[in-house]
Amino acid sequence: MLGIFFLGVLAPASLGLSALAKLQPTGSQCVEHECFALFQGPATFLDASQACQRLQGHLMTVRSSVAADVISLLLSQSSMDLGPWIGLQLPQGCDDPVHLGPLRGFQWVTGDNHTSYSRWARPNDQTAPLCGPLCVTVSTATEAAPGEPAWEEKPCETETQGFLCEFYFTASCRPLTVNTRDPEAAHISSTYNTPFGVSGADFQTLPVGSSAAVEPLGLELVCRAPPGTSEGHWAWEATGAWNCSVENGGCEYLCNRSTNEPRCLCPRDMDLQADGRSCARPVVQSCNELCEHFCVSNAEVPGSYSCMCETGYQLAADGHRCEDVDDCKQGPNPCPQLCVNTKGGFECFCYDGYELVDGECVELLDPCFGSNCEFQCQPVSPTDYRCICAPGFAPKPDEPHKCEMFCNETSCPADCDPNSPTVCECPEGFILDEGSVCTDIDECSQGECFTSECRNFPGSYECICGPDTALAGQISKDCDPIPVREDTKEEEGSGEPPVSPTPGSPTGPPSARPVHSGVLIGISIASLSLVVALLALLCHLRKKQGAARAELEYKCASSAKEVVLQHVRTDRTLQKF
């Protein structure tokens, strides 16, 4: 029975269950972090299982000989064989003592069948199988092991005289210690209550969550444990120490009873914590961690320091914090007109009609004063303006102080000289029509975009380049086609060699390509230059021809008498040599 703590026969405690109001715990055992309790009274397997669950536990699992020894101790305290339920059941199917392992096909209420122990009252060689639903009780009145608890299969609807519950806890506390040298100790007694409803005074260990009532001091203590620890300690809701005779007043180090109220003391190198009972070493802080802004250490006195604050702050009464100084309330006023305090400083403002210039409030001037707007200046703020234009005009994008004609319609009135009504101007992209009306030029109808999509707007147009251009899908007036190299074309066909065209055979005309307007202008200029050059050459040749003819006539007239004409035969004759 290693690791078993005998808790003795405990006083009855109500389960708080209407269906099992008569069932009361009669004993309890704790092994490490598990506690087991025996409840006496008639109950079916379902009633027993629900009763354990209401107490935050479940029917007992007997996985080792240690758990079997706990059952023996609990049953030995009863004068009759209760045959209590344990947490082993066969919901459906039949058992098999030979092929289904030590549990014969049964499983624990926790949903598994892991075990290193089994003790069946029915021998394994019994041939007739038992079929579920079946549940298991333990009894000491069996033929297989008289006096030793053995497992018996029974229908789950059977009412037994008790059941065993199992509870798991992460930590536990020792019973309260009382200082026997204290004269008051002889009159002090403690009564404990466990979370699963068992109460009494004779315990070896108590699970976390148990409570202790100490009389006649009127103390109510609770077993608690920090998260992640297995060793609990007794505590109460109030801070500070309780009576030093019980559990050292809850103090971690010393309990001082020399004063009217008990007080906990800590070693010199440790500080008392907020609960008034535990001790901890102080956290060493650097000088800068002690002051809100700046800390200056005193080299002459080790451990001493002084705190300082930034500009606009002053040191608080505690000597560590820094408080903001309201500069606006300091005399004289640091601002010429309005002052607004800020954290660590202030801001100056001026009344309406004034602006802050170099720390002074000066009266605002008309923002249009000195402006160079061509038509009219319009203030937009006390310090800014914008230029506006007459109807039919708009500010130039690159020179907003100047105006240019603007028309957002297909036709608008022209800007004519009042002294010369025939002298009129139109916005760019418009043409003067009917003397005083500017009409939009439809560049799209003039083929400005060639084969690309064209969109006309008042005074302008845009081209959307086609898919066969380098800027396909983009808006541009330079939608040049993608150049195609003839030597990179691949011949496609049936695999026969290509046939070269014979001389004189007609060939298809070359595909028409759109020509850019700049190219057309260049061609026109070159053609005109060529015509002018040809005309000049023709004039030169005619002049030269006239001079030569005059010279020839003169020569013919002066040598007419000296010329002897000789008859020349035109027929061919053979000459012999």
From Swiss-Prot:
SUPFAM superfamilies: C-type lectin-like (SSF56436), EGF/Laminin (SSF57196), Growth factor receptor domain (SSF57184). Glycans are attached at N113, N243, N256, N408, S494. InterPro entries: C-type_lectin-like, C-type_lectin-like/link_sf, cEGF, CTDL_fold, EGF-like_Ca-bd_dom, EGF-like_dom, EGF-type_Asp/Asn_hydroxyl_site, EGF_Ca-bd_CS. The keyword tRNA processing does not apply. GO terms for biological process: blood coagulation; female pregnancy; negative regulation of blood coagulation; negative regulation of coagulation; response to cAMP; response to lipopolysaccharide; response to X-ray. Disulfide bonds join C135-C156, C244-C255, C251-C264, C266-C279, C287-C295, C291-C307, C309-C322, C328-C339, C335-C348, C350-C361, C368-C377, C373-C387, C389-C403, C407-C416, C412-C424, C426-C438, C444-C454, C449-C463, C465-C479. Residues 31-167 form the C-type lectin domain. Endothelial cells are unique in synthesizing thrombomodulin. Residues 17-517 are extracellular. Residues 498-512 have a biased composition (Pro residues). Keywords: Blood coagulation, Disulfide bond, EGF-like domain, Glycoprotein, Hemostasis, Membrane, Proteoglycan, Receptor, Repeat, Signal, Transmembrane, Transmembrane helix. Disruption phenotype: Thbd-deficient embryos die before embryonic day 9.5. An overall retardation in growth and development starts on embryonic day 8.5. It is a single-pass type I membrane protein. Residues 477-492 have a biased composition (Basic and acidic residues). Its main location: membrane. GO terms for cellular component: apicolateral plasma membrane; external side of plasma membrane; extracellular space; plasma membrane; serine-type endopeptidase complex; vacuolar membrane. Endothelial cell receptor that plays a critical role in regulating several physiological processes including hemostasis, coagulation, fibrinolysis, inflammation, and angiogenesis. Acts as a cofactor for thrombin activation of protein C/PROC on the surface of vascular endothelial cells leading to initiation of the activated protein C anticoagulant pathway. Also accelerates the activation of the plasma carboxypeptidase B2/CPB2, which catalyzes removal of C-terminal basic amino acids from its substrates including kinins or anaphylatoxins leading to fibrinolysis inhibition. Interacts with ITGAL, ITGAM and ITGB2. Interacts with thrombin/F2; this interaction switches the specificity of thrombin from a procoagulant to an anticoagulant and antifibrinolytic protease. Interacts with ANGP1 and ANGP2; these interactions significantly inhibit the generation of activated PC and TAFIa/CPB2 by the thrombin/thrombomodulin complex. Interacts with PF4; this interaction enhances generation of activated protein C. Interacts with HMGB1; this interaction inhibits HMGB1 inflammatory activity. This is Thrombomodulin. It comes from Mus musculus (Mouse). The gene is Thbd.
